[in-house]
């Protein structure tokens, strides 16, 4: 399973990119707004740090608005993927983008039927939201399993991005459920590196090593 980072913070991306683990980046309007910066400027900077798909979301609600926004975004860099909400207007846009060879990431997916429809419209990626499903007592990991099973049976090439990741367990369970990608917040990526036994082991090694210097 590939790892993306879910952020629009350039310093977070810069730091994690040095680990050599990132295959892509996802952003959304909320993350961009949090940074207080121009969307296109942020996306341009991200493309200079990560060589992989960079999802930039359209905010228009109509087919026409989505097409106009996408024209500007795809000019930034060939790695830009147009992120589109799972709506009827979004599906029309995804179909048109597919005809034009523009990659898309259909976001706000909360059911297997939504994922199937998005894939058949031509989506490159679909993003089921794990954390938000957990919030209402639904089974986000089970959803990824269902989508992966359907895509496998019917030889659908659309890739599944586990999104709305809240903790390490989401990442591991998404991998086991068949997600092709997990897009992970900065804090969760940092937590994935840590384990208390690792810290204890390092302390012991250093204590033993320091004894040899006496």
UniProtKB/Swiss-Prot annotation:
SUPFAM superfamilies: Aldolase. GO terms for cellular component: cytoplasm. GO terms for molecular function: aldehyde-lyase activity; transaldolase activity. Gene3D superfamilies: Aldolase class I. Pfam families: TAL_FSA. GO terms for biological process: carbohydrate metabolic process; pentose-phosphate shunt. Pathway: Carbohydrate degradation; pentose phosphate pathway; D-glyceraldehyde 3-phosphate and beta-D-fructose 6-phosphate from D-ribose 5-phosphate and D-xylulose 5-phosphate (non-oxidative stage): step 2/3. CDD domains: Transaldolase_FSA. Its EC number is 2.2.1.2. The active site is at 83 (schiff-base intermediate with substrate). It comes from the Bacteria. Its main location: cytoplasm. InterPro entries: Aldolase_TIM, TAL/FSA, Transaldolase_3B, Transaldolase_3B/F6P_aldolase, Transaldolase_AS, TSA/FSA_arc/bac. Keywords: Cytoplasm, Pentose shunt, Schiff base, Transferase. This is Probable transaldolase. The lineage of its organism: Bacteria, Bacillati, Bacillota, Clostridia, Peptostreptococcales. The gene is tal.
């Amino acid at each position: 399973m590939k790892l993306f980072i879910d952020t629009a913070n350039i310093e977070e991306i810069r730091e994690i990119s040095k680990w050599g683990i990132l295959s892509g980046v996802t952003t959304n309007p909320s993350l961009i707004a949090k940074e207080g910066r121009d969307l296109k400027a942020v996306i341009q900077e991200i493309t200079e740090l990560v060589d992989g798909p960079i999802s930039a979301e359209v905010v228009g609600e109509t087919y026409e608005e989505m097409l106009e926004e996408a024209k500007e975004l795809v000019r930034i860099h060939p790695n830009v993927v147009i992120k589109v909400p799972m709506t009827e207007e979004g599906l029309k846009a995804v179909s048109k983008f597919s005809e034009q060879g523009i990659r898309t990431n259909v976001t706000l997916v909360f059911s297997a039927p939504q994922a199937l429809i998005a894939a058949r419209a031509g989506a490159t990626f679909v993003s089921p939201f794990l954390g938000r499903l957990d919030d209402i007592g639904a089974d986000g990991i089970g959803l990824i399993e269902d989508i992966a099973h359907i895509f496998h049976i019917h030889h659908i090439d659309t890739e599944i991005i586990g999104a709305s990741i809240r903790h390490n367990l989401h990442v591991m369970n998404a991998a086991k459920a068949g997600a092709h990608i997990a897009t992970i917040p900065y804090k969760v990526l940092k937590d994935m590196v840590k384990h208390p036994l690792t810290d204890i082991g390092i302390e012991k090694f250093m204590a033993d090593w320091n004894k040899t210097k006496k």
